[in-house]
């Protein structure tokens, strides 16, 4: 029977999210459809909204439904994701937020494409895309499960309907809409779930959590210790190289603020996990055959994935479930747009523009991104319909990102000079091969290699092969890069063998971004006839390759626009002059000023100086 109150609550909360999303989308500068404006909200996200949207990086439909499901099926000990993703925000803030934001990148793939080339960056886009699709699929599956409980709709129908609504909503705007709906989303989750907990806990059918038969804590068997560590490391470090995270980092006004938001959001992740943990424990203490629930008991995998909406539906009064179910549904819906936008942004910029259409206009890129939003939404829908467990889907989404992307992102951010395209491709192949060799029970992939401790009964690998794949990928990246560099630079391999043109056979028109300038907020390099800059405040002009004035790289001080522009121009001129001096091999004389000395010490008369700018 259809729950009228539940349907009304969903409609009202959806309208709230939709109105906020449309209102936030109007904050975009009129007529400004640039990549930064749509993908990064003009790098103008403030502290209050930033805290909420950074927390919502992980806190969404999959987070709350998956946490409750894990508590019910395996216990608190095995509910690693809230703690793992919280730590990933901490480590991301310490090691990645500051350098990534200082260099003014637009997507997470920018530094990878910078170091390894456009086509290798396109290859690295694939695991990033898989991760975003898996995550969005988990969100849609959670929403479909919620709707099937509330209005008694078939699960498949509800997933398809939910994805259509999410895609439609995402097309309304870029990061402005995503960020401001995140504020509503977290308020809905926090207030809606906490309102339901006292009523569910006091329900007459709920037993005592201290009962020995109600094991909501769980335990780790000795044979699963390495598996437990493997999953923990996967969540912590596999939670860093995600565009949904760096989208928030790169949209912050300053690098310092990006770090601060990461730390505060980590605490927010733990705080927001408390309500679903309690709801999962309440569900564990409930004999469901004594309630109004009419499904199979003990609960099957299909039912356990819906455990949170089931608690709200069957253990709370109608007027309470009105808020709880509606709030959860709206929260799930608003979190779907973030992953879809992230994947579409990376495709439009790092694949379509930088590989196929380097001279594409900004409006063309925006339209490509909108089409990509629809395609990514369809892929996520297919995944949501084919994988039964939300928590399994949620955990699996970090696998490829962890073993492939994390080692490569670590190297290009902190050790760029010690890696090249040969090492990147080799590491990619090694990581993918080892990960696939372990199989995947959720996808029905049989293992090619049964590592030590393999459980024949559960078809599960107890050996930490994911972490092994990540470490071997890192070692391969470093060693192959070192070997190829040594072979080419020593002359043992002729330059013509440098097929990737990344060691000695580098053409003049290849674009590379170097180290940040002394100002710490600028990044541009003259390479051949073109200058490339990722959002850096260098030479004025609308085209990105000529540099675009970027208000995000201003300090937190409210400088007048004219003053900020003057500082940017002076810094850019100083950079260009320094690079030209280095290129011509001249340096100022230390003796009397008025002469320039060549590196051989020969005096040269200076040209008459004029006052015109570059």
Swiss-Prot record:
* Transmembrane domains' residue ranges: 6-26, 45-65, 76-96, 120-140, 159-179, 186-206, 226-246, 263-283, 306-326, 365-385, 395-415, 425-445, 468-488
Report membrane topology: Multi-pass membrane protein
Ranges per topology, Cytoplasmic: 27-44, 97-119, 180-185, 247-262, 327-364, 416-424, 489-614
List the Gene Ontology MF annotations in alphabetical order.
amino acid transmembrane transporter activity; choline transmembrane transporter activity; choline:sodium symporter activity
Which intervals of the chain are annotated as region Disordered? 583-614
What is the protein's name according to its record? High-affinity choline transporter 1
Q: Which ranges does the record list as Extracellular topological domains?
A: 66-75, 141-158, 207-225, 284-305, 386-394, 446-467
- Similarity section: Belongs to the sodium:solute symporter (SSF) (TC 2.A.21) family.
Q: What does this protein do?
A: Imports choline from the extracellular space to the neuron with high affinity. Rate-limiting step in acetylcholine synthesis. Sodium ion and chloride ion dependent.
A GO CC annotation recorded here is: membrane
Q: Which domain of life is it from?
A: Eukaryota
**Compartments it resides in:** Membrane
Supply the alphabetized keyword list: Glycoprotein, Ion transport, Membrane, Neurotransmitter biosynthesis, Sodium, Sodium transport, Symport, Transmembrane, Transmembrane helix, Transport
The biological processes this protein is annotated with in GO are: acetylcholine biosynthetic process; amino acid transmembrane transport; choline transport
Species name: Drosophila melanogaster (Fruit fly)
Question: Which Gene3D superfamilies did the record assign?
Answer: Sodium/glucose cotransporter (1.20.1730.10)
Give the primary localization class.
Answer: membrane
Q: Which residues are glycosylated?
A: 289
């Amino acid at each position: 029977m259809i729950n009228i109150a539940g349907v009304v609550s969903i409609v009202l909360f959806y309208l709230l999210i939709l109105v906020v999303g449309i209102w936030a989308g109007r904050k975009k500068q009129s007529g400004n459809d640039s990549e930064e404006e749509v993908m990064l909200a003009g790098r103008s996200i403030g502290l209050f909204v930033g805290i909420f949207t950074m927390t919502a990086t992980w806190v969404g439909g999959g987070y709350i439904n998956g946490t409750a499901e894990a508590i019910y099926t395996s216990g608190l000990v095995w509910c690693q994701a809230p703690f793992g993703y919280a730590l990933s925000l901490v480590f991301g803030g310490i090691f990645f937020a500051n350098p990534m934001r200082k260099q003014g990148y637009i997507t997470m793939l920018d530094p990878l494409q910078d170091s390894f080339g456009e086509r290798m960056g396109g290859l690295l886009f694939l695991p990033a895309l898989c991760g975003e699709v898996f995550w969005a699929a988990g969100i849609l599956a959670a929403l479909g499960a919620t709707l099937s409980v509330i209005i008694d709709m078939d699960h498949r129908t509800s997933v398809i309907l939910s994805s259509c609504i999410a895609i439609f909503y995402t097309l309304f705007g870029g990061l402005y809409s995503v960020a401001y709906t995140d504020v509503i989303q977290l308020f809905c989750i926090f207030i809606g779930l906490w309102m339901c907990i006292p009523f569910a806990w006091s329900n007459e059918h709920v037993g005592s959590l201290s009962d020995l038969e109600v094991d909501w804590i769980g335990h780790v068997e000795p044979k699963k210790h390495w598996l437990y560590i493997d999953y923990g490391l996967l969540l912590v470090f596999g939670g860093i190289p995600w565009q949904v995270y760096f989208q928030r980092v790169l949209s912050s006004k300053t690098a310092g603020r990006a770090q601060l938001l990461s730390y505060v959001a980590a605490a927010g992740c733990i705080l927001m996990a408390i309500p679903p943990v309690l709801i999962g424990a309440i569900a564990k203490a409930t004999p469901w055959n004594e309630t109004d629930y009419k499904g199979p008991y003990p609960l099957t995998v299909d039912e356990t994935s819906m455990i949170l909406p089931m608690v709200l539906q069957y253990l709370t009064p109608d007027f309470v479930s009105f808020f709880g179910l509606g709030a959860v549904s709206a929260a799930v819906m608003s979190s779907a747009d973030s992953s879809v936008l992230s994947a579409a942004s990376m495709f439009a910029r790092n694949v379509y523009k930088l590989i196929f259409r380097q001279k594409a206009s900004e409006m063309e890129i925006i339209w490509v991104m909108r089409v990509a939003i629809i395609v990514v939404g369809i892929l996520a829908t297919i995944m949501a319909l084919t994988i039964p467990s939300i928590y399994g889907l949620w955990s699996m989404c970090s696998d490829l990102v962890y073993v492939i992307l994390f080692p490569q992102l670590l190297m290009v951010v902190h050790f760029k000079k010690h890696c090249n395209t040969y090492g990147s491709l080799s590491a990619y192949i090694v990581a993918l091969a080892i990960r696939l060799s372990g199989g995947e029970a959720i996808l029905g992939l049989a293992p090619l290699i049964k590592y030590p401790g393999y459980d024949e009964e559960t078809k599960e690998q107890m050996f930490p092969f994911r972490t092994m794949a990540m470490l071997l990928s890192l070692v391969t990246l470093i060693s192959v890069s070192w070997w190829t560099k040594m072979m080419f630079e020593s002359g043992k391999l002729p330059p013509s063998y440098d097929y990737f043109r990344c060691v000695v056979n580098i053409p003049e028109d290849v674009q590379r971004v170097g180290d940040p300038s002394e100002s710490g907020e600028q990044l541009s390099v003259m390479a051949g006839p073109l200058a490339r800059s990722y959002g850096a405040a260098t030479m004025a002009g609308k085209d990105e390759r000529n540099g675009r004035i970027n208000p995000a790289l201003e300090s937190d001080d409210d400088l007048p626009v004219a003053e900020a522009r003057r500082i940017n121009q002076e810094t850019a001129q100083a950079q260009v002059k320094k690079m030209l001096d280095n290129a011509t091999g001249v340096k100022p004389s230390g003796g009397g000023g008025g002469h320039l000395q060549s590196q051989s010490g020969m005096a040269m008369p200076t040209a008459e100086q004029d006052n015109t700018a570059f």
